[in-house]
Regions:
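A short, conserved beta-to-alpha structural element at the edge of catalytic cores
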Residues: 47, 95-108
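Conserved donor NDP-sugar-binding/catalytic core segment of glycosyltransferases
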Residues: 1-28
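Alpha-helical elements of Rossmann-like donor-binding domains used by nucleotide-donor carbohydrate transfer enzymes
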Residues: 2-3, 77-81, 115, 119-122, ...
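A recurrent flexible, glycine/aromatic-enriched loop bordering the glycosyltransferase active site
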Residues: 20-27, 35-58, 62, 77, ...
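Catalytic core of nucleotide-sugar-dependent glycosyltransferases
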Residues: 95, 108-132
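Membrane-proximal basic amphipathic "stem/tether" segments
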Residues: 125-151
């Protein structure tokens, strides 16, 4: 809250996240170290770790809520719409903010991972953002794979 109080023009922020073992939270599985947003990043499969993404309510009022037409990727579409399309003032905070257990709807099955990626590509198209299927998957696979080796 103080970050927003001290920066009245800041509209959103996000940080790093650690996924832990589902049954033993002392065992880190994946370190999602993010970075500052660069325009065009969503087209390369990038997005902030959504549990660390905090937004002023005024942004929701101005640009809308989650689009539930995206069954699995509504969080990614929302961040894409706010950050990439509407260019809100967002800041990456290079700190670990969230530690959570592995799981969730997307990672529940390969089918859901496929559906989520398809929905993200559909969202890119719906927002007229350029995307290249090969570039999207190559960047995404490399960046996600590296997260299992970072501590």
């Amino acid at each position: 809250a103080s970050l927003f109080n001290n920066n009245p023009t800041l509209e959103a922020c996000y940080a790093d996240l650690v996924y832990t073992n589902k049954f033993d939270t002392s065992k880190n599985i994946r370190y999602w170290k993010s970075n500052q947003f660069i325009p065009g990043s969503f087209s390369k499969g990038w997005c902030p770790p959504h549990p660390t993404f905090f937004v002023r309510s005024s942004v929701y009022e101005q640009f809308g809520n989650f689009n539930l037409n995206y069954r699995i990727a509504s969080d990614v579409e929302l961040m894409m719409r706010f950050i990439e399309v509407h260019k809100i003032n967002v800041r990456y905070i290079p700190e670990l903010w969230i530690k959570m257990r592995m799981g969730g709807t997307t990672n529940n099955s390969f089918k859901n991972i496929f559906i989520q990626n398809k929905e993200v590509l559909n969202a890119l198209n719906s927002h007229n953002l350029s995307n290249n299927l090969i570039s999207f998957f190559v960047h995404k696979i490399i960046s996600r794979s590296l997260q299992f080796f970072k501590k």
